[in-house]
């Protein structure tokens, strides 16, 4: 069974824990209790493959930012979560993305942009803005509501698919690089 290390990042209060708990335990946590770092595991079937999701729910508060490099090193894929009612949390996404790329020392890292709290009546970030940013980054965009469970499975499962794609691409590149160059043949005269 394949294990996927998923990391949920974003500013404080965007609903990272609520999304994760909704996926793992099928219930909505409505009280805000700032997370330092929590880890969850769940076995799921995605596209016919049974897999184990190892999900790290991270601290959004700035005082825990020193811990970020460590979990970014070990994560295979990242949910970049913002709250649709918080323009600031949306602006912070670029900082998280750049830090992930720096720590992973890679231009392309599996990520999904997640606009959470879509059940709320007033949005400060419209979906066109979010779609445009996701397009610029070359990553999928999923709208979610941890409260109603809308898009929750889709967000995590899409991230697993992005990790699979990334592994397939790296595998293909590796095979191409390992092929010997057969155009030149040595002959002893």
UniProtKB/Swiss-Prot annotation:
Which residues are annotated as pro-peptide in the record? 187-189
Recorded catalytic activity of this chain's protein: GTP + H2O = GDP + phosphate + H(+)
Listed GO biological process terms: border follicle cell migration; cell fate determination; cellular response to starvation; chorion-containing eggshell pattern formation; compound eye development; defense response to virus; determination of adult lifespan; dorsal closure
- Per the database entry, which stretches of residues form a coiled coil? none
Residues annotated as binding GTP are 10-17, 57-61, 116-119
Where does the record say this protein resides? Cell membrane
Topology within the bilayer: Lipid-anchor
Is this entry keyworded GTP-binding? yes
Query: Which is an annotated GO molecular function term of this record?
Result: G protein activity
Q: What positions are modified (Cysteine methyl ester)? A: 186
Stored CDD domains: H_N_K_Ras_like
Q: What happens when the gene is disrupted?
A: RNAi-mediated knockdown in the prothoracic gland (PG) delays the onset of pupariation by prolonging the L3 larval stage.
Q: What controls its activity?
A: Alternates between an inactive form bound to GDP and an active form bound to GTP. Activated by a guanine nucleotide-exchange factor (GEF) and inactivated by a GTPase-activating protein (GAP).
* Motif Effector region, residue range(s) on this chain: 32-40
Root EC class: hydrolase
* GO CC terms of this entry: membrane; plasma membrane
Keywords, sorted A to Z: Cell membrane, GTP-binding, Hydrolase, Lipoprotein, Membrane, Methylation, Nucleotide-binding, Prenylation
**Which tissues show it?**
Expressed in the posterior termini of the embryo, restricted mainly to the embryonic central nervous system, and in the eye imaginal disk.
In short, the EC number is 3.6.5.2
Query: Lipidation, kind S-geranylgeranyl cysteine: residue numbers?
Result: 186
| Source domain of life | Eukaryota
Q: Which family does it belong to?
A: Belongs to the small GTPase superfamily. Ras family.
Q: What function is annotated for this protein?
A: Ras proteins bind GDP/GTP and possess intrinsic GTPase activity. Plays a role in eye development by regulating cell growth, survival of postmitotic ommatidial cells and differentiation of photoreceptor cells. During larval development, mediates Ptth/tor signaling leading to the production of ecdysone, a hormone required for the initiation of metamorphosis.
Name the chain's protein.
Answer: Ras-like protein 1
Recorded source organism is Drosophila melanogaster
């Amino acid at each position: 069974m394949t294990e996927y290390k998923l990391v949920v990042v974003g500013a404080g209060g965007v609903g990272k824990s609520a999304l994760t708990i909704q996926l793992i335990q099928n219930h909505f946590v409505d009280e805000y209790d700032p997370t330092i770092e929590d880890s969850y595991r769940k076995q799921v079937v995605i596209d016919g493959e049974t897999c184990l999701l190892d999900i790290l729910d991270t601290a959004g508060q700035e005082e825990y930012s020193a811990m970020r490099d460590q979990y970014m090193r070990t994560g295979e894929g990242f949910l970049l979560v913002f709250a649709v009612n918080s323009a600031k949390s949306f602006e912070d996404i670029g900082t998280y993305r750049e830090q992930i790329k720096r720590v992973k020392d890679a231009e392309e890292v599996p990520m999904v942009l997640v606009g959470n709290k879509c059940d709320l009546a007033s949005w400060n970030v419209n979906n066109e803005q979010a779609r445009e940013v996701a397009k610029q980054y070359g990553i999928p965009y999923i709208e979610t509501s941890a409260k109603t469970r809308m898009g929750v499975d889709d967000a995590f499962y899409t991230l697993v698919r992005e990790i699979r794609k990334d592994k397939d691409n790296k595998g293909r590149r590796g095979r191409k690089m390992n092929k010997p160059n057969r155009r030149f043949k040595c002959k002893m005269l």
